[in-house]
Amino acid sequence: MNRTPLVAGNWKMNGRKDLLTEMADALAGYAGAAEVVICPPFPYLAAARSAMPGAVGIGSQNVSEQEDGAFTGEVSAPMLAEVGCGYVIIGHSERRALYGETDAQIASKFAHAQAAGLVPILCVGETLEERDSGNTDTIVCGQLRAVVDAVGVAAFANAIVAYEPVWAIGTGKTASPEQAQAVHACLRQFLAKDDPDIAQSLRLLYGGSVKADNAALLFAQSDIDGGLIGGASLTADSFIAICQAAE
């Protein structure tokens, strides 16, 4: 099955308005086949939607598991949709590790995002200790299963899953193309047990120190449909090169 490649730039807590302008100018000249999404920090979401070409999607890096109410500092899915977001990253390893997000919370965020019309980008991944102990497949499929059990497999007809090995996030280490492909294939096969058609159509992204010089080999793998890009998404030239590698 042909799946449209997607490259999402996760700026994390980086960037200023001048980066929005620089990136918008660069993406205005991009006419490739890959779908492109930019995920800046909360304060820049509306400005990003105004600045970016219409074909570029805007995503949030997080969302509340609550609809509304007395939750100081939280941002709801309907609010994100109202300012022009079409996507939201859910369950990033930094959210799990630094803020203690649980599988149950992540599943709730996933459901709230979809209810507001947002496309969740669900992140799964293992630590180096878990990989070294041979538990990679158990961990990542368990993280996926927690959400499938909560929302149903049909929800993944309009979702994206990103495999981000925790040991490769911001470390300069990258899973080899073969290592990444093996996990992506495992995730697709795992979901196929519930629904083969959804499993085949689901886009699986790789995230973990993807750069312009290693993107093409990663994206050439049969079950890798693009990338969730961190540091390399903060420079227009490198991000465009990665988008081109995904075509």
Curated annotation (Swiss-Prot):
One of its GO terms (biological process) is glycerol catabolic process. InterPro entries: Aldolase_TIM (IPR013785), TIM_sf (IPR035990), TrioseP_Isoase_bac/euk (IPR022896), Triosephosphate_isomerase (IPR000652), Triosephosphate_isomerase_AS (IPR020861). It catalyses: D-glyceraldehyde 3-phosphate = dihydroxyacetone phosphate. Keywords: Cytoplasm, Gluconeogenesis, Glycolysis, Isomerase. The active site is at H92, E164. One of its GO terms (molecular function) is triose-phosphate isomerase activity. Pathway: Carbohydrate biosynthesis; gluconeogenesis; Carbohydrate degradation; glycolysis; D-glyceraldehyde 3-phosphate from glycerone phosphate: step 1/1. Its main location: cytoplasm. Substrate binds at N10, W11, K12, G170, S209, G230, G231. It is an enzyme of class 5 (isomerase). The keyword Cytoplasm applies. Pfam families: TIM. GO terms for cellular component: cytosol. It comes from the Bacteria. It is found in: Cytoplasm. Transmembrane segments: none annotated. Belongs to the triosephosphate isomerase family. Involved in the gluconeogenesis. Catalyzes stereospecifically the conversion of dihydroxyacetone phosphate (DHAP) to D-glyceraldehyde-3-phosphate (G3P). Homodimer. This is Triosephosphate isomerase. The gene is tpiA.
